[in-house]
Amino acid sequence: MEEFDSEDFSTSEEDEDYVPSGGEYSEDDINELVKEDEVDGEEETQKTKGTKRKAESVLARKRKQGGLSLEEDEEDANEESGGSSSEEEDAATEQQKGVESEDARKKKEDELWASFLNDVGPKSKVPPSTHVKTGEETEETSSSHLVKAERLEKPKETEKVKITKVFDFAGEEVRVIKEVDATSKEAKSFFKQNEKEKPQSNVPPAVPSLPAGSGLKRSSGMSSLLGKIGAKKQKMSTLEKSKLDWESFKEEEGIGEELAIHNRGKEGYIERKAFLDRVDHRQFEIERDLRLSKMKP
């Protein structure tokens, strides 16, 4: 047994160390090696084909994605165009509906007006001439009202009359020309005086003239003339003469408005005095009213 075991061990070692040469291969071994090479080549070709297929599939997927994106863009554009076209159609339909509603409303108004005219009858039909006349009448009335309003607004401008008065100042004759209203008392008295002083020569004599020998008539005529000549003129005081000179100077120089504006200011003595007088008078009236109210039971 021990020998057998040693032999077996030796044979096993020999088997491990033994390497067959190429000439010692059998046909079956060669066929198996060829098949293994072919299998390895097929696996490599399959691997390369798999990688190619993977690349092609990736490209195809990318193309498909690009196509999908393009298709999506086209669909969005189509949707937008469809939406705009639908909006235009809606606007057109709304416009058409509005026109139809306006037409229907006008038609309804015409029908109502026709029915109203039928109910009223021929009395409502008035000839156009009457309308024109009424329009003219209204225009005339409106114009007359406007004229009346203007007359009321505009105060009546009174006519001015120049009168001349003769005064005696220190033996000199002074003529004063004043411009007053025609309806004033001063103007009326001046006109009456002029009518009285008119010579009676313009008036035709009602009684035949007496002979020249009558001394009474001649004496009366001479006395009237002497009376007119020797009539006393109205005397003028120094204050009146200075006032007259000042007024004439203002008119010649044209400083009346400037003086009036100056007197209305703070430096105007006359205006200030008048204002203070008005204040005193108003204060007196208030005190009087208070006293009277206290005196009443």
Swiss-Prot record:
The modification Phosphoserine is found at S81, S84, S85, S115, S214, S248. Keywords: Developmental protein, Isopeptide bond, Methylation, Phosphoprotein, Ubl conjugation. The keyword Phosphoprotein applies. Residues 1-157, 190-222 are annotated as: Disordered. It comes from the Eukaryota. Residues 97-111, 147-157, 190-199 have a biased composition (Basic and acidic residues). GO terms for cellular component: Swr1 complex. Brain. Residues 216-297 form the BCNT-C domain. GO terms for biological process: chromatin remodeling. There is a cross-link at K148 (Glycyl lysine isopeptide (Lys-Gly) (interchain with G-Cter in SUMO2)). Pfam families: BCNT. The keyword Phosphoprotein applies. The modification N6-methyllysine is found at K217. Residues 176-215 are annotated as: Hydrophilic. Residues 1-18, 25-43, 70-79 have a biased composition (Acidic residues). Gene duplication of the ancestral BCNT gene leads to the h-type BCNT (CFDP1) gene and the p97BCNT (CFDP2) gene. The latter contains a region derived from the endonuclease domain of a retrotransposable element RTE-1. This repetitive sequence associated with the BCNT gene is specific to Ruminantia. May play a role during embryogenesis. This is Craniofacial development protein 1. It comes from Bos taurus. The lineage of its organism: Eukaryota, Metazoa, Chordata, Craniata, Vertebrata. The gene is CFDP1.
